[in-house]
Amino acid sequence: MAVIKAVSSKAGIGQALDYVTKEEKTEDKLVSGLHCEPDTVKDEMAATKELWGKTGGRTYKHFVQSYHKDEHITPEQAHKNAVELAKNTEAWKGHEVLIATHIDRGHIHSHFIVNSVNYENGHKLQWSKADLQNLKDRCNEQSRQQGLHVPEKGKTFSGEEREETVAVSYTHLRAHETLANLV
């Protein structure tokens, strides 16, 4: 079962690239570049931004494709899947993308660092909820074709019903506590 998510980060692009390419996380072999070379990706992404005069604002988008710890997939196949997803993501056409598959935790996961500036036309990456859903759908189809689990909303990896959880904001929680103290 592979899950795709967009990562919100305050780290600069250099820090993000350094993190995802750490040798102990990737065994120094599960790193690929789409429209860039892994060894020179920082310079290439910076050059694209300089070329088009777009060095400010959001400098990259970060995504992760994670497999459940009990999924039967090799790190090499997970990396191959990630590269295939990146190549076929329409919104990423013309953007440098670094793909790094990590094997240092209990589950295999791949990071995608996407340059925010298109090297062909200088346009900034426009990413919508529909684009993310399309990426998730293609990831699910990839899993289906390989006989891997496909995530089902409200179910665990083994297919059992997940306990219902409720997300509460900190502000809402504090207001609730204040009301309880008044009573």
Indicate where each model-derived feature is located.
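N-terminal nicking endonuclease/strand-transfer module with a His-rich metal-binding environment
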Residues: M1-R174
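Single conserved hydrophobic/aromatic residue that forms the stacking wall/gate
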Residues: H172-A175, L179-V183
